[in-house]
């Protein structure tokens, strides 16, 4: 009887550690350079969309339309919290609150992160603001340069 109870407690503890580790990994994966999906850019009339998320969760947005005009190029402090963890899917949902409001984005929105595909969707109330893919090369290059600068 006690051995079954202890086994269940150990299993529960292992599950909690596993869930926490995966959520922490997703938060770390969120950091880095993201670029706009070509299909999304074409449908939305944009030339480029870049998002850089720093380790302190400051977000740098750069959005350029097809005419080459900068619609948005700004650094915005963001509060990013893990909203929902889906255990059986590689999708994480993060709630984002921007300290400075910009006309192209609502003050609060969600990051939907699919770490298996390296895809990030910025959405609010089922309205998609951007579809982005992780640029692992630019992320690694930025981390390497930062090491040598500091």
Curated annotation (Swiss-Prot):
Gene Ontology cellular component terms for the protein in this record: virion component
Assigned protein family: Belongs to the asfivirus EP152R family.
This protein's UniProt keywords: Signal, Virion
Signal peptide positions on this chain: 1-23
Predominant localisation class: virion
Name of the protein this chain belongs to: Uncharacterized protein EP152R
Organism superkingdom: Viruses
Compartment annotation: Virion
Origin species: African swine fever virus (isolate Warthog/Namibia/Wart80/1980) (ASFV)
């Amino acid at each position: 009887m006690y051995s079954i109870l202890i086994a269940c407690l150990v299993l529960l503890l292992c599950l909690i550690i596993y869930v926490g580790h995966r959520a922490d990994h997703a938060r770390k994966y969120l950091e880095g350079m993201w670029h706009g999906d070509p299909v999304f850019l074409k449908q939305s009339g944009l030339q480029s969309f870049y998002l850089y998320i720093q380790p302190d969760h400051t977000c740098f947005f750069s959005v350029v339309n097809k005419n080459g005009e900068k619609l948005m190029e700004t650094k915005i402090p963001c509060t990013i919290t893990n909203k929902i963890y889906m255990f059986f899917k590689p999708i994480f949902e993060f709630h984002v609150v921007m300290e400075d409001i910009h006309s192209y984005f609502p003050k609060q929105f969600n990051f939907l992160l699919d770490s298996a595909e390296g895809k990030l969707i910025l959405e609010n109330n089922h309205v998609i603001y951007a579809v982005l893919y992780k640029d692992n090369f630019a992320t690694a290059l930025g981390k390497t340069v930062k090491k040598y600068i500091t």
